[in-house]
């Protein structure tokens, strides 16, 4: 006996069988696919370009409105090109190489057009809806600091929300940092290892130690996930770790009235790794810049940060806010989430402080 069959499209089928269906279970929270975890970082240039452009679109729209310019058609056209490249096989990196080349060409074109809309000028504009008073690197060919190979100065803009201002470097007399076996800054007492990892990060204001175990420790593992080479990371990836040697121990590289940079050089059998660590006079932030000549295959690089923070939750930045994730592995579901993603920051905090 043949069952009764009716030909219909997907939309009609879903509407007929799923709409107002009270027997369907509801899922509340983050959807997590227990495979293809490598796509969080595969083709990272694309992910970085996509996120940068998302922010530039906001700036272009805002400045167009404030100037009374009608750029809606142009911005809409550029948005569509960006959204095409957010297709699920493009942005994750699970594609063939020509797709990568096409996407990066699109990103370059979109950014050039957005830069025309945003424009240039002699003043800096704060696009945030609150005062920008965090220490910021401002490019300047005559600057006294170097970041990502570019000269500039570290300044506190102090620009109100949605306002513009000129920025000028201020000079401070006197030493703000003591460099010995322990590095003393206004905020921290820091003990470095030769490979750039931090043996101790003592907070002077709060009177507590933040480092617990390996902190800013570079680790490289053998990465042979099987069928999906560039897309998967196996749960046992830590089983085989690759030796890293220090070719140049950490030492002071550059210093001015706002920032002190320390440099170390590391190497494996085939690759070299330059790590620059920055400490600041007017910021609790510690910045790490990595310059890598990567010639490895089937290897996975990570930086480990063992934090002296007791919390069951981590707050992770996403494209539209943040998400709260568990930090423990009590259940099989939590154990499966050994690899998660976030954008600019991840925050581990107690009531009186934390590490982000």
What are these regions (language model features)?
Residues 287-291, 302-307, 319-320, 342-346:
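Short, well-ordered alpha-helical packing segments
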Residues 1, 20-23, 139-140, 304-310:
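Short secondary-structure boundary/capping segments
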Residues 139-149, 309-320:
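Solvent-exposed beta-hairpin/edge-strand motifs
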Residues 72-76, 84-304, 327-332:
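Catalytic and substrate-binding regions of extracellular carbohydrate-active enzymes
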Residues 1-119, 125-127, 156-160, 168-171, ...:
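Active-site and substrate-binding clefts of carbohydrate-active enzymes
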């Amino acid at each position: 006996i043949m069952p009764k069959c009716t030909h219909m499209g997907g939309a009609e089928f879903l509407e007929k069988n799923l709409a107002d269906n009270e027997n369907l279970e509801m899922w509340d929270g983050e959807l997590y696919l227990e495979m293809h975890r490598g796509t969080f970082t595969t083709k990272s240039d694309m992910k970085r370009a996509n996120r940068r452009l998302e922010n530039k679109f906001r700036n272009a729209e805002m400045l167009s409105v404030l100037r009374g310019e009608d750029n809606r058609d142009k911005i809409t056209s550029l948005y569509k090109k960006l959204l095409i490249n957010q297709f699920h096989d493009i942005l994750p990196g699970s594609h063939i190489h020509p797709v990568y080349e096409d996407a990066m060409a699109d990103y370059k074109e979109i950014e050039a057009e957005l830069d025309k809309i945003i424009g240039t000028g002699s003043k800096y504009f704060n696009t945030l809806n609150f005062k920008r008073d965090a220490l910021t690197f401002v490019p300047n060919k005559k600057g006294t600091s170097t970041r990502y190979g570019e000269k500039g100065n570290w300044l506190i803009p102090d620009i109100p929300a949605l306002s513009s201002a000129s920025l000028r470097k201020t000079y401070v007399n006197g030493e703000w940092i003591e460099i010995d076996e322990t590095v003393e800054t206004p905020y921290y007492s820091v003990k470095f290892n030769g490979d750039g990892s931090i043996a101790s990060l003592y907070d002077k204001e709060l009177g507590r130690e933040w480092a617990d175990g390996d902190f800013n420790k570079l680790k490289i593992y053998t990465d042979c996930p099987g069928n999906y080479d560039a897309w998967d990371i196996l749960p046992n990836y830590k089983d085989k770790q690759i030796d890293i040697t220090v070719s140049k121990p950490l030492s002071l590289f550059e210093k001015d009235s706002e920032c002190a940079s320390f440099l170390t050089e590391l190497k494996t059998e085939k690759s070299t790794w330059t790590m620059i660590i920055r400490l600041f006079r007017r910021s609790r932030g510690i910045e790490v810049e990595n310059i890598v000549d990567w010639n490895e295959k089937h290897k996975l690089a990570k930086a480990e940060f063992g934090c002296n923070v007791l919390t069951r939750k981590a707050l992770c930045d996403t494209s539209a806010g943040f998400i709260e994730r568990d930090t423990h592995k009590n259940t099989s579901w939590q154990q499966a989430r050994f690899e998660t993603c976030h954008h600019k920051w991840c925050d581990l905090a107690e009531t009186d402080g934390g590490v982000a």
